[in-house]
Amino acid sequence: MNANELTIAEARDALAKGELSAVDLTMACLTAIDAGTPLNAFVHLTPEIALDQARASDARRGEGAGALNGIPLGIKDLFCTRGVASQAASNILKGFKPEYESTVTSKLFAAGAVMLGKLNMDEFAMGSSNETSCYGDAVNPWKVDDRKLTPGGSSGGSAAAVAADLCLGATGTDTGGSIRQPAAFTGIVGIKPTYGRVSRWGIVAFASSLDQAGPMTKTVRDAAILLGAMAGHDPKDSTSADIPVPDFEAALTGDIRGKKIGIPREYRMEGMPAEIEALWAKGREMLADAGAEIVDISLPHTKYALPAYYVIAPAEASSNLARYDGVRYGHRAKLGQGDGIVDMYEKTRAEGFGKEVQRRVMIGTYVLSAGFYDAYYNRARKVRALIKRDFDQVFAEGIDAILTPATPSSAFGLGEMAHADPVEMYLNDVFTVTVNLAGLPGISVPVGLDAKGLPLGLQLIGRPWDEAGLLNHAHVLEQAAGFVEKPRKWW
């Protein structure tokens, strides 16, 4: 086994025992990244920074080193990293190198982590297939025949890199499923924490009331380790919660006897593939066998979640993206003689933003306009409150976690949705958006393969601030499923 194939927990133990050096581990990852170029997962490599950090980790070993000392990670291009290109996969931020470090990356580096580079993603995190990136498509390491498959989105580069063992873990962000859907498509673990658990400061904003950063890893234990380093109060983020961060790894007891797992009847979508239905049933059985009580529940406003999300998220995006105007940073269009400032804004935004971003900014501006604010935006906000209330009632009745499918299908081919109605692409988020609208924690766990040999995941949704309990349920599901399959190396 090559060092880059280790889990975070295995590497941590090997480093602590002196069986492995952080420099050797980092070199193994850099070699794998080099060989993994066809996956287009990494878009900005930082080998000098990585090796400097690895050497510092080796020097620190043993003297109260951090929880991630010497662990090489990939960072999604949405996180601002000081002096390193941070473009949110958009041409409008071409060449942008922040003079500051996001809170999440600061915390990871303080814990001893090593940054290998920045990872591909959908432009401004808007997409479910990593096909809206200015860097080109990231490619799923899993393959059927000779078709290249999507790794999902928006955190597609993060998912591909972890699944292909290019790094030991990665950061992702999740606004409507952007950690959980790619994790399911690539056979890895991805958790979106409770809104406010992880600081958003220094992360390029998409929809500020929905965005949340989280870890993408090979195992649930690794997710617990990485989330512990990422989480915590940050005075620089007004939505960051000032509550203690528990020891998530210690919570993985494997004991869920007597816990109540809710199965929402509204998630049985019309036309749901039989494989997804069977996987969901298998998940219920595995949790019941572990001693949990399975309870049918109702979340009556689920059917309104997708339309409400696709009003609220673009509305917030259109406001957040107004700051990209070619004046202070990023791309500025070449102007003709006589062009004024309005021409500069228009040309810069037309050249800098991709089609999907333009579409969402247009939708957002429309639903926030005077004539439609009440008809669309305010109505969507009311629906959001009802969706949150559904979850509150279920948890008040004693449900500990909710089990649902993570995605409506396994990974689809790159380019397959190119001529589809945009709404068809949006349907990929059907099982995940409710979690963001309600601000809850959700995790995707790989549970099996479909008939084509592609990974499928199940989603567990937890009570607010109970990531510890959620991770323990996920750990039990992971152990019962025994998913150890890896993609066959073709790159």
From Swiss-Prot:
Enzyme class, first EC level, given as a word: ligase
Family designation: Belongs to the amidase family. GatA subfamily.
Name of the featured protein: Glutamyl-tRNA(Gln) amidotransferase subunit A
Organism of derivation: Cereibacter sphaeroides (strain ATCC 17025 / ATH 2.4.3)
Functional description taken from the UniProt entry: Allows the formation of correctly charged Gln-tRNA(Gln) through the transamidation of misacylated Glu-tRNA(Gln) in organisms which lack glutaminyl-tRNA synthetase. The reaction takes place in the presence of glutamine and ATP through an activated gamma-phospho-Glu-tRNA(Gln).
Gene Ontology cellular-component annotations: glutamyl-tRNA(Gln) amidotransferase complex
EC number: 6.3.5.7
UniProt keyword Lipid metabolism present: no
Gene Ontology MF terms: ATP binding; glutaminyl-tRNA synthase (glutamine-hydrolyzing) activity
